Regions:
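Extended hydrophobic alpha-helices typical of membrane-associated regions
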Residues: 37-40, 253, 257-318
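Small-residue-rich segments of transmembrane alpha-helices in multi-pass membrane proteins
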Residues: 55-64, 114, 175-189, 235, ...
């Protein structure tokens, strides 16, 4: 029996060589603009426009890497730390804004942040934080086992800090531990142990961070009182300048003792002397507790960290 022949499928017409697909350029332009705006909001979320947090994280790490490495830190380790500082600072900004998303709209200085202004959704912020956390984890896995353990503890410090200021008046000291945690990590990675000098440096950074973050909190003191955020600026009250001065002296003393432990000489001491001058200038800035001046004093701490590092590096060079 003959099978019934089916009609052949229709041939596709030949493509016209002059044919050009209609991509609707105006739609592509709109999509590109929307993507650009979104990326700009993400950049604002991780504070790319305000690198002060990167510097304040970087200088303690550089102090530790130079001392632990006797002035010659491993280049690969240095790159890992620099990348880790950027990633962890970015992640810290994201989780801080997520934790404060209901408080920031009620504070003058923070009400225009992407999460507070609802230009970035909470889910987007969490996704960005997870991505940054995965990158930080990968970087930590390049370190020795002991350094990895310290890195894990540092991650826990960074994640828990934003919620602490709701319950205690001393979150600035906790922030100092988080910002200085790269110090024991550096010694663990380079020497395989965490000696006494590492804890002296960490103590100095905790005190220094309490200094500059109290100045930062002085900017928002009135709003923080209204919305219920706790800080050392509120706890210290009218004694804020005196207590800041005491902590500045104690931070310099801890750095001096660390220098003795590392047998550092004149260049390092000169760096500390220059740092003391910046502390005096900061005291002058905050004399009237004017918010803009307090914010300038906070930013000025970058130069304190810089001159201490320059003195340290020159000491190993000469």
């Amino acid at each position: 029996m003959n099978a019934e022949l089916l009609p052949a499928p229709p041939r596709k017409p030949r493509r016209d060589p002059k044919y050009k697909p209609d991509f609707k350029p105006h739609n592509l332009r709109d999509a590109a603009l929307a993507l650009g705006r979104t990326l700009c909001e993400y950049a604002l979320l991780i504070r790319l426009h305000r690198p002060i947090g990167i510097w304040l994280l970087m200088w303690p790490a550089m102090w530790a890497l130079w001392i632990a490495g006797q002035g010659r830190p491993d280049q690969k380790l240095l790159l890992i730390y620099l990348a880790g500082i950027f990633v962890m600072r970015s992640a810290g900004c994201v989780i801080n804004d997520y934790a404060d998303r209901d408080f920031d709209p009620r504070v003058e200085r923070t009400r225009d942040r992407p999460l507070a202004a609802r230009r970035v959704a909470s889910g987007e912020a969490i996704a960005i934080f997870i991505v940054l956390g995965l990158i930080a984890t990968w970087l930590a896995m390049q370190l020795d086992p002991l350094a990895r353990l310290y890195a894990a503890a540092g991650g826990l410090l960074a994640v828990t800090y934003p919620w602490l200021k709701r319950y205690v008046y001393l979150p600035q000291f906790y922030l100092g531990v988080a910002f200085g945690w790269s110090i024991p990590m550096a010694f663990a990675a380079i020497t395989g142990e965490v000696p006494r000098i590492a804890w002296l440096l960490l103590a100095a950074v905790v005190l220094w961070a309490a200094v500059y973050d109290t100045m930062y909190a002085m900017v928002d003191r009135r709003d923080d009182l209204r919305v219920g955020i706790k800080s050392t600026a509120i706890l210290f009250g009218d004694a804020d300048r005196v207590i800041i001065g005491v902590m500045q002296v104690m931070a310099l003393l801890a750095l001096w003792l660390a220098g003795d432990e590392a047998e550092l000489g004149l260049w390092y001491r000169s760096g500390l002397a220059a740092g003391a001058m910046f502390f005096v200038y900061q005291q002058w800035l905050i004399r009237d507790r004017e918010p803009d001046a307090c914010f300038r004093a906070f930013n000025n701490n970058h130069y304190f960290g810089l001159v201490v590092f320059v003195g340290l590096a020159l000491d190993y060079l000469y």
